[in-house]
């Protein structure tokens, strides 16, 4: 980042940071905007070192201007940043981006007026830029320099790698700067594959040429001596015009920029091809549950560049769909920012969402909620256990504490029988049951159980008389009385 941020130093950097992004806004340009502009230039196959000088900024603006009408918001933002940087290099005091664009427009108009005035005075021979393919030789004649093989190789490589993705259009605009229709046809003919796309491009060029002929009807009658004819649509496309005629139109007084007109037709056809090669609709671009917000924004704007819509519609898509198609975590954050949030604020707020730290924080919150719910369930379950068992002191007889914690004087003797000399655990006092027997009994079975008795093994003798009973012997009555205890002690005088 250090090399990218070293574009401005000292007083220029202070002047850069004082310029506002919008009129009346609070945000101003920072070093990060220079870093972003350098990365964007690399993405468009332009040299980021051009930002270090005012002349380099002029070259960048000349290459970006043809794409401003059909380009995306990123290209416009890049052009605005370069224009502001140009004012800083030229020591032009501006308050915001709007004033910088106005100053650049004034400078460009003055430069254009100077070029036109010099062309009227000197035949437009000394004011032709050496950067264009049409240059002036030693004899003062306008000659054409063919496109270098390096430029053609770069164009073919972009088409092969990108396959008519949205990046192809600004790349074509940069490589075809100042080219003649013959140069543009040479670039199109070097594309070997994608013949279906090239046929679509030819159809678009033919339609635009027919529209040009309709809007510019041919002049009837012979031309005056020394006057060149007006170009037709096929002349602009380079099919019925020679290279010398194209040079004459482009360097005439007034000039007819047949190269720029043909270039606009080609860019219009490339926009249709890009839309065909990008079948994914902007409505289908959604953020994954674990996808970083920055990657989602990159995919969103890449698909938005291929949309054939006006800037107002694209602005609505950015304000609405970018938030609507985000994942739930980012959507919650973006809705909290409000409607007027900028893209920079959105990316700053959603930074880290989906990463390890965010996952750990979400997991910790989920675990804390789960533990709280479990504790609530345990408390609810404990409410169904009923009242606790009260404890009673054996020393004072009161409830609520144990004998070892009792503050009353120590009770002497056994806590059961009250006698001294032994403890309750060693007390021999036994409690009688409801039958009057000491419990537990030391002999035989308990008294409330049926006692053992001798049962005869043979049936009793049957009486031969009628209605006679055998009287029991006194000995047997005494035995039965001993087997069953008396209940007089329990029931009083009952028989």
From Swiss-Prot:
Transmembrane segments: none annotated. Residues 73-77 are annotated as: Interaction with membrane phosphatidylinositol 4,5-bisphosphate. Residues 12-19 are annotated as: Interaction with host AP3D1. A motif (LYPX(n)L motif) lies at residues 483-490. GO terms for biological process: viral budding via host ESCRT complex; viral translational frameshifting. A motif (Nuclear localization signal) lies at residues 26-32. The modification Asymmetric dimethylarginine is found at residues 388, 410. This is Gag polyprotein. It comes from Human immunodeficiency virus type 1 group M subtype G (isolate SE6165).
